[in-house]
């Protein structure tokens, strides 16, 4: 939840309990954020976060450091055709920011059931947001159950998009530009493979 002062932060943490994740609103790369395990750390991070935020706002939530971090790259066109281009796993999980994490494709520690469950949710999320082009959907996943959270949806090309393109041979930037201009996935060919359309989901037999 969003708070604008240290007093509001302390009141919220009394409800949530420690540890908590604190993020400064409208910053990049985790600037001004951190994990608070006690009131001293809470004071320090909240004051710093509010100072770094363009809106003098910090977001506080339950810390999920032991949870897995899973990503899906999704491509969707104006006709509603939607494919999963790549599935990735942040090896160090939620405790390390995705920009500093080690990422592997495809995911190595989730079950087939978990893979398909999160894939379906990623496609539903892209559809609900009416994404036209490419997007990245990130999840936290409890390693001891199938509980999950949607962390964020990036409706743009990102660091993950570059990795996904390299790992799969699916030219995300080129095809996303074509889709945004009105082309549909079935009528676009993957110029890297030369034989598949953009509707073809890459399948990796390597890491």
Task: Give the role of each language-model region.
Residues 1-33:
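A conserved helix-loop-beta module that forms one wall/lid of the active-site cleft
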Residues 19, 29-31, 36-207:
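ATP-dependent carboxylate activation and anion-phosphoryl transfer catalytic cores
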């Amino acid at each position: 939840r969003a708070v604008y002062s240290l007093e509001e932060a302390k009141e919220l943490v009394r409800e949530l309990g420690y540890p908590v994740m604190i993020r400064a609103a409208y910053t990049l790369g985790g600037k001004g954020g951190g994990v608070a395990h006690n009131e001293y750390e809470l004071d320090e991070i909240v004051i710093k976060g509010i100072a770094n935020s363009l809106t003098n706002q910090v977001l506080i939530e339950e810390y999920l450091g032991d949870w897995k971090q899973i990503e899906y790259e999704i491509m969707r066109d104006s006709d509603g055709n939607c494919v999963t281009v790549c599935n990735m796993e942040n090896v160090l999980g939620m405790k390390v920011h995705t920009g500093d994490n080690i990422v592997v494709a495809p995911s190595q520690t989730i079950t087939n059931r978990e893979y398909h469950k999160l894939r379906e949710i990623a496609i539903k999320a892209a559809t609900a947001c009416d994404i036209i082009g490419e997007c990245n959907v990130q999840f936290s996943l409890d390693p001891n159950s199938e509980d999950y959270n949607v962390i964020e949806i990036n409706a743009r090309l990102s660091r993950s998009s570059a990795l996904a393109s390299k790992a799969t041979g699916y030219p995300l930037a080129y095809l996303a530009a074509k889709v945004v201009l009105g082309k549909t996935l079935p009528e676009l060919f993957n110029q890297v493979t030369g034989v598949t359309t953009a509707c073809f989901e890459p399948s990796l037999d390597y890491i």
